[in-house]
């Protein structure tokens, strides 16, 4: 059974909580589809080559059809000419987005969390709030955890807490709206607030 580690306010181990058995039935393909869709949405789609209809010039036939001994040509915009259009080149009007429905997104997140739990890298804490807003306090929290590359997930975005975590290189603070399967998979460990963890693991 996959279990998340419960932490107290000092981020010391204080017990375990089991993930629902239904998480075991989720197929890894849901995570694959979501990550593929997420990365596709980040593509800049800036590669562009002009086709023969977009190259300037070419209104005049470059030489006579017959009598010159050269191959016939109708326009200097032809791909066979230097400076002509490009055949089958990249076009910036392509849409790389891949559709993933809400159910698949949810299953992908649940599967990613289950994987972290099986690795012993999923932690549940009552609150991640840093009232001081100071980076040193957020760093102390991270150092106590003794993990590399950690995703902290809070239920509600708090400005002071965000500022406290913002400058830490190996940490990232996400709220409930930002949390997704890609973020969970990208970090080595995940610390999530109890209220949000319960929302994700409940039925329905």
UniProtKB/Swiss-Prot annotation:
Which spans does this entry mark as compositional bias, Gly residues? Answer: 55-71
Listed under GO cellular component are: ribonucleoprotein complex; ribosome
Q: Which UniProt keywords apply?
A: Ribonucleoprotein, Ribosomal protein, RNA-binding, rRNA-binding
Tell me yes or no: is Ribosomal protein among this UniProt entry's keywords.
yes
Q: For this entry, list what GO says about its biological process.
A: translation
- What are the start and end residues of every segment in region (Disordered)? 49-74
One MF annotation (Gene Ontology) recorded for this entry: structural constituent of ribosome
Query: What's the family?
Result: Belongs to the universal ribosomal protein uL4 family.
What functional role does this protein have?
Answer: One of the primary rRNA binding proteins, this protein initially binds near the 5'-end of the 23S rRNA. It is important during the early stages of 50S assembly. It makes multiple contacts with different domains of the 23S rRNA in the assembled 50S subunit and ribosome. Forms part of the polypeptide exit tunnel.
Q: What is this protein called?
A: Large ribosomal subunit protein uL4
